[in-house]
Amino acid sequence: MLQAQILIDKDELHNEKKLYEYIMEFLFAAKVEGATAFEGVSGFGPGDRKMQRPNRLFSFDEPPMMITFVDKEEKVKKVIKELRNEFKGGLIITQPVEEW
């Protein structure tokens, strides 16, 4: 099995829809084994000089999201290629996983 992780900004749009909602609907329609969307609570990127954490006085300018999904390797690669035809942003990584 292969797991894919898609890292995007929460407020990023695909046409008029939130990108993470579009991706989740896309994965559901593609009948992947399972997918989950997570909202980031802390993080940093290449240009940051400190950790970013939202609180009462501060919120992320671009809150991070991670969508992860798992399926057979061929299916994951096919779905990623189809997704990349729809949007070029974000970061997509994959890793082999073992189901227990």
Q: Over which residues does each language-model region extend?
A:
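Positively charged, small/polar-rich N-terminal and surface patches that mediate targeting and assembly
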Residues: M1-W100
